[in-house]
Amino acid sequence: MKITVKMAYLAAAILFVAAPRVLRAKDGSGGQSAPQAVCVLRVDATTCLPTPGQEGTHDAQDETVDEPRGGISRVLHAWMAMGASTEAQQPNWLSPVATTSGRLKQELRYDSWRQSGAAGGVYNFGGGKGLEFLVAPRVQLMIGAPPFTLPTQSGANSGFGDLPLMLKARLFSRPQGEGDSLLTFILGATVPVGDPLYGNGKPVLSPALAFGKGKGKLDVQGTIGGSLPVGGDTKLGNQLVSNTALQYHALRLLWPECEVNATFFESGKNDGKKQVFFTPGLGFGRVHLRGRLSLSLAAGVQIAATRFHTYNHRAIVSLRLPF
C-alpha cells in the first residue's frame, strides 16, 4: 500500500478517535478548561476581560458589547462569545504566508500571487482562501471562492479554478504562558467546478495534521499531509506535502518568518519527483479596527530550491480580516 493511501487511513482513524473530544467545549488533558474571558454583567451591557495569557488575542475583548435583545442577536452574540473563548485557549501566532496554521479563526482572508515558470508568468486571485468561521468550540470551516487565474502571455486563456473547502478540528492546544502549543486535524477539499484548463476535473481530498510550538517570541508552525484525487488520477497523482514555518514576533506588529514548502509526487505525470521551496516572508498585524474586527497582512516569495519545480518563483500577498 502506498504512502499516501496509508496516510489517508491514518487521518481517518485520528478523526474517528478524536471526534468525541473535539465537540466538547473543554480543552487539554484531564478535562480541565483552559483560561477563558471573565465576563461581568451590568444592567445595560456585558464586559469581557481577558485572563492573564490571553492578551493580544483581540483588543475588542476589553470593549463593551451591547446586550442582545432579539433572537437572532442572541445567537450572534453567543457565536461571537464562543469565538473569543476558543481563541483565548490557543496560541496567538500570526498565520504564515504559505503554511496553513493549526489555529482556529474567524476571519475573511484573500490571497493573491504572481508566479513565473518555463511557460511564462501567471497571476492568481483568491489563492484558495475565503471565509473561515467556527461551527463548534473546537471545529472550524472554511468556504473559499474559486481562484481566478490570469496568464501574462498574450492570447493565453484565463479562467476559474475549483471551489476550495476546509475543516479544522483542534485536538489539543495551550495558550501563551501555559505551553504555547497546538495540534489540529485538517481536511481540505476542492469541488470540481472550475474551467477545464485550471480545474482538476475531480474532487481532491487533502488530509493533514497541523502542529505548532512557541517559546517566547519564537514559534514553529507546520503541516504534514497529502493530496489525494478521489478515484485516482493519472495526471494529478497522489502527493505528500510538508510545510514548516519558523516565525519571530520581532515588534508589536511585525512577524518575520522563513518557510520550507515541500511536495513529493507519487504516481501521476510527476511520479517519483520532489520539489522544495524556501519562502522568506513578513507578517504585519493585528491592527484593531472596530469592535472585534482587526486587520493583518503578510507577504513572501517562494524560491525553488530543487532542480525539478513546477514554477520558479511565486510572490504572495495576503490580506486577513479577523473578527
Q: What function would you assign to each model-found segment?
A:
Residues 1-9:
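Bacterial N-terminal signal peptides that target proteins for export
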Residues 4, 13, 28-31:
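N-terminal targeting leaders only when they are immediately followed by extended low-complexity/repeat-rich tracts
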Residues 9-18:
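Bacterial N-terminal signal peptides
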Residues 19-25:
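Sec/Tat signal peptide C-region and signal peptidase I cleavage site
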Residues 26-323:
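Transmembrane beta-barrel domains of Gram-negative outer membranes and organellar outer membranes
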